């Protein structure tokens, strides 16, 4: 019997392949071939290294705003978790918060696993998906309607004690914003702007309404007649509401996946995780430290704070770090090899969502191309 991933890949092959390779040469042609093979409707890709000019390629459509360009903004989905972690670690480095303090010490509501009431939950656990929370139906039903998070949490506890097991949780990651707001008495949006985006000179926001440039839609390539899951034009028209007001009970739907930036911003953010500067060397090391394995989800992956830690020889001989994003049909990736000084970013409006061992096929192919190649991207 065919499994869902095999069926998906068969359906994908039935779609017409975009002609992105036409006019391309060298590695740019190989990148274009991967984007075509995975039916990317629109994409911006960058490969970079410490000792070479970056290789950048933009193809296809961003949806209602027209062709993808270097300046196109994308909702980067779960890469937001890595971006949020950068800011959290800088705040910890500056002594403004603690990674290992009980979050109940600052939150206006209690977060404690009922089966393990004596085990405190910390920011380190929230950043590493070891907090005991799971994305139960109550989370999916509540996050879109902004139900207070304290009303959702009781129905979202898993079976494992906090700090003992990995369970990918958007609710847990989203709670990071609530903790920061309660600790600093500022909105999450302003915390990220003041302590991360402005410091790095990055144009980014967690609210589409704050993006002045062209913002890509996001939609699924299968079925090909589907509507945009993320209609950028419609999202921009919504009122920003309490974006500048701390609301720990209601701002749990931001940090896990709502960050919006362009390729220039994404490269600056990835490089901030790749080398000391924004963070000092000890904090960089703490961010990359593997805290827990993905278990049955992937034999090659472990979790750091806001980072995947990937040891898969078929992709790269070195350990890779970064994060994947997948929402509304858009597939994104941001990964780096600190030993070789190389990195890659993928931003799309729509692409294949097929996955192997948690990583998407399109990210896997681009990572193999970027991190297994030697010398210049232009040879």
Region locations from a protein language model:
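Short active-site loop at a secondary-structure junction
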Residues: 36-46, 65-125, 160-171, 254, ...
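Short, contiguous pre-domain boundary segments
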Residues: 6-17
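Glycine-rich phosphate/pyrophosphate-binding beta-alpha loops
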Residues: 252-258, 321-336, 340-353
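A structural signal for the main folded, soluble domain(s) of proteins
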Residues: 69, 76-79, 87, 136, ...
């Amino acid at each position: 019997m065919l499994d869902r991933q095999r069926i998906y890949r068969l359906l994908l092959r039935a779609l017409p392949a975009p002609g992105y390779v036409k006019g391309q040469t060298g590695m740019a042609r190989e990148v274009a071939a991967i984007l075509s093979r995975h039916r990317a409707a629109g994409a911006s890709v960058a490969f970079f290294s410490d000792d070479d000019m970056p290789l950048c390629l933009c193809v296809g459509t961003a949806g209602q705003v027209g062709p993808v360009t270097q300046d196109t903004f994308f909702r980067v989905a779960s890469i937001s978790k890595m971006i949020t972690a950068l800011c959290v670690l800088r705040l910890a480095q500056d002594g403004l918060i603690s990674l290992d303090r009980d979050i109940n010490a600052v939150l206006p509501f209690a977060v404690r696993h009922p089966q393990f009431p004596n085990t405190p939950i910390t920011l380190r656990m929230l950043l590493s998906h070891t907090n005991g929370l799971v994305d139960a139906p109550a989370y999916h039903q509540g996050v879109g309607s902004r139900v207070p998070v304290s009303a959702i949490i009781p129905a979202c506890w898993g079976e494992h004690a906090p700090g003992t097991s990995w369970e990918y949780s958007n609710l847990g990651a989203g709670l990071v914003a609530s903790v920061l707001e309660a600790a600093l008495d500022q909105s999450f949006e302003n915390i990220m702007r003041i302590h991360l985006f402005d410091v790095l000179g990055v144009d980014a926001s967690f609210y589409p309404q704050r993006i002045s440039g062209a913002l890509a839609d996001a939609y699924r390539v299968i079925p090909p007649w589907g509507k945009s899951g993320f209609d950028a034009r419609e999202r921009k028209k919504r009122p920003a509401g309490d974006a500048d007001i701390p609301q720990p009970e209601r701002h749990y739907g931001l940090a896990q996946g709502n960050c919006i930036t362009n390729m220039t911003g994404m490269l600056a953010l990835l490089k901030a995780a790749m080398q000391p500067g924004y963070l000092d060397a000890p904090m960089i090391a703490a961010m990359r430290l593997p805290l827990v394995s993905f278990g049955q989800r992937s034999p090659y992956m472990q979790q750091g704070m806001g980072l995947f830690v990937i040891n898969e020889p078929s992709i790269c001989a070195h350990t890779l770090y970064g994060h994947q994003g997948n929402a509304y049909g858009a597939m994104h990736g941001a990964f780096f090899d600190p030993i070789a000084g190389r990195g890659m970013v993928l931003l799309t409006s729509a692409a294949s969502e097929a996955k192997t061992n948690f990583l998407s096929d399109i990210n896997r192919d681009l990572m193999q191309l970027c991190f297994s190649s030697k010398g210049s991207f232009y040879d």
